[in-house]
Amino acid sequence: MTTSRPDNSHDAAPKGYWIVFATINEPSRFDNYTSVAGPLIAAQGGRVLARGDVATVVEGTVPGRPYLIEFPSYAAAQACFNSAGYQEAIALRDGVAQFQIVIVEGFVPPASSPR
């Protein structure tokens, strides 16, 4: 699914986000993935803003534990996911966890008009 992007050229660059839903089947083996993926994400400026240790689904069905990871830009979020290192890290979670990841561009509201 693609959508048109708002023109934010006059504003500060919007951040990029990974919206992740993870179903972890083998927590002890999942640590192998996190020990590799965590530093790769951090190297791209990524940081976990929220994780679903405590979460309430108020509408619909959520396909796993939610995570929200922020990057300095949409391009950085894409670059991290597409990097050779992260693609290798994905193999560490095969059979251990299932992920659904959406990369989104943050919204930067237009600057206020002077009064």
What does each of the following model-derived ranges do?
Residues 87-102:
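C-terminal structural segments of small proteins and small subunits
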Residues 1-65, 72-82, 105-115:
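Short S/T/G/P-rich N-terminal loop/turn motif that feeds into the first structured element of a domain
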